[in-house]
Swiss-Prot record:
The keyword Oxidoreductase applies. Pfam families: DHO_dh. It is a peripheral membrane protein. Belongs to the dihydroorotate dehydrogenase family. Type 2 subfamily. Its cofactor is FMN. This is Dihydroorotate dehydrogenase (quinone). It comes from Brucella melitensis biotype 2 (strain ATCC 23457). The lineage of its organism: Bacteria, Pseudomonadati, Pseudomonadota, Alphaproteobacteria, Hyphomicrobiales. Catalyzes the conversion of dihydroorotate to orotate with quinone as electron acceptor. Substrate binds at residues 65, 110-114, 170, 175, 244-245.
Amino acid sequence: MSGLFETLGRRALFTFDAEQAHGLSITGLKTGIVTCRTPEDPALSVKVAGLKFPNPLGMAAGYDKNAEVPDALLKLGFGFAEVGTLTPRPQSGNPRPRIFRLVDDKAVINRLGFNNEGHEAAFKRLSRRAGKSGIVGVNIGANKDAEDRIADYVAGIRRFYQLARYFTVNISSPNTPGLRNLQAREALHELLSRVLEARDEEGNMCTLKRPVFLKIAPDLTDEELDDIAAEADAQKLDGIIVSNTTLSRSGLKNPENSNETGGLSGAPLFERSTVVLARMRERVGPDMPLIGVGGIDSAETALAKIKAGADLVQLYSGLIYRGPGLPGEILRGLSTAIKYEGVSSIAELRDRDTKEWAARKLIS
């Protein structure tokens, strides 16, 4: 189906503005007209942070911003879906146009700015799926004008605690001024302390401990990675997602739209995000879960992330260019890789190439 989408479906969708096309795809998933058969392979099952994922492939945050179609995404074959980023109050984000396709590079630049309908709208939708199977995580953020941004993250933990299977603390979007400053050691210490305290308080009231992951940028120095790894270990964080979009424009083939401000995602992000993933794996050791994101558009790129150190992987931009058949294609490829490598599970392939990836040089 990926091939058919690339030939016909993408051509039709790409006649629309990028944001309109996104809205149409959400509508398609809501109506149920977009369905794909995907394989179920027990060898793809992965246990991470106390959760059993049917496979390691997830839908990254940013697509289903308002928790409209998480179950439809799971039906495409994703082992988990992440909704958001959600802020306490609704906000419109940055002015349009704010999404730019770089077709020759199979990439996207966005400067959306956490546009979403806020906690209450998403809470109502997620409440309707209470009790359903399937792992749905909630990506939480802060309102642009928040006086205390950390309080916004705490509010997200408390509001969605009963509904989220896990949380992602998003402090790495380049489109909210000053947000990435929360990755600095002192600020990160306060953020994680308050967020994890809220998680523990909520968990103690209902005997459920929800994992909390931290989503970081791919543009960090080795020293900044050192600080994040040390803080994550000290706070007993449940995992790290590597990575968000990049400010780098290295390696782009076509200059059209490349000078637009915002975060770059898609194929050009693969190398940088995978190097940073491997370097983080070297820092945190074998026990902390890592989720690899950035440039995944095939079974080969998904497998490379796993071999570089990822327990789980996520994609978004790849779906834009390859279509709804991509998850199934990736899962079939991973099943084939397990047999080819002569192992019994996908988890056994983790870290095979970590040292090689970590040693690669990054071009800014």
